[in-house]
Amino acid sequence: MELLPHEKQVVEYEKTIAEFKEKNKENSLLSSSEIQKLDKRLDRLKEKIYSDLTPWERVQICRHPSRPRTVNYIEGMCEEFVELCGDRTFRDDPAVVGGFAKIQGQRFMLIGQEKGCDTKSRMHRNFGMLCPEGFRKALRLAKMAEKFGLPIIFLVDTPGAFPGLTAEERGQGWAIATNLFELARLATPIIVIVIGEGCSGGALGMAIGDVVAMLEHSYYSVISPEGCASILWKDPKKNSDAAAMLKMHGEDLKGFAIVDAVIKEPIGGAHHNPAATYRSVQEYVLQEWLKLKDLPVEELLEKRYQKFRTIGLYETSSESDSEA
């Protein structure tokens, strides 16, 4: 597994403890209580390091090559999954994976953005950057879910919509705008979870829902830290400053009422214990579905509308308040 800079100290300590334990089998250098003390010290070290991460270090965790992706969540959470392909207009976009899913006996339409796991699959998936047909495919499946009365799960993980000329020629902006318009009035529960990167319109085009949650080390932002640094300071090396200023992680966004919940990850990030992460996401999905499933459609849509309508609302005191 690829090591991030802040993980090196932990890995070195783990190696040292493993060597002690191996030698201890032959020579009994340490008692069992002393070994337990070493393990506890390791746990404390992990807690100290991972509770004091900078925003940029959390971005690095979010981008870790071994971080679980949409296809991994499908394998880890679903008892059944039937993939559906194509936008019925141009072609299938491999950057979107979607289909009928069964989780704990309940049927959903699960639609996620997929980056790929190695060079070949990343090229095939276009690194998770959706073309217009990807957004149209997602909307087609969402409308199918509405038709069959299925709740929808959106898994967001993209560095942004594909900015290429061909995508623009095929109506990239139009496709994203259409998704925002249509998903806002779709008459079925929608649960959105940002599992990795959630960048710009590429994320927003699949992030309109009744509840929006984020994994602890995922991020959701109008732009990547590197992009922000290039624009503001003309220096992409200021990415750590940009990551801090963008307030792109769950605790900040929850405070701004942009997301509703932050799902805890295992210590070190989702890639350290994918199975535990799948369980946490599955529990959250089922818990939220139980809250949404019996709401009248009119109430569901009104709450969804108001949720997004009030994002970014800025209020000033009235003249009477200031005089008082």
Swiss-Prot record:
Principal place of residence: cytoplasm
InterPro entries named in the record: Acetyl_CoA_COase_a_su, ClpP/crotonase-like_dom_sf, COA_CT_C
Listed transmembrane segments: none
Keyword Cell membrane: no
Reaction catalyzed: N(6)-carboxybiotinyl-L-lysyl-[protein] + acetyl-CoA = N(6)-biotinyl-L-lysyl-[protein] + malonyl-CoA
Domain CoA carboxyltransferase C-terminal: 37-291
Gene Ontology cellular component annotations, sorted alphabetically: acetyl-CoA carboxylase complex
UniProt key word Cytoplasm: yes
Annotated GO MF terms: acetyl-CoA carboxylase activity; ATP binding; carboxyl- or carbamoyltransferase activity
Alphabetic keyword roster: ATP-binding, Cytoplasm, Fatty acid biosynthesis, Fatty acid metabolism, Lipid biosynthesis, Lipid metabolism, Nucleotide-binding, Transferase
Compartments where found: Cytoplasm
Complex formation: Acetyl-CoA carboxylase is a heterohexamer composed of biotin carboxyl carrier protein (AccB), biotin carboxylase (AccC) and two subunits each of ACCase subunit alpha (AccA) and ACCase subunit beta (AccD).
Family membership: Belongs to the AccA family.
Role summary: Component of the acetyl coenzyme A carboxylase (ACC) complex. First, biotin carboxylase catalyzes the carboxylation of biotin on its carrier protein (BCCP) and then the CO(2) group is transferred by the carboxyltransferase to acetyl-CoA to form malonyl-CoA.
Name recorded for this polypeptide: Acetyl-coenzyme A carboxylase carboxyl transferase subunit alpha
Organism, as annotated: Chlamydia trachomatis serovar D (strain ATCC VR-885 / DSM 19411 / UW-3/Cx)
Gene from which this protein is expressed: accA
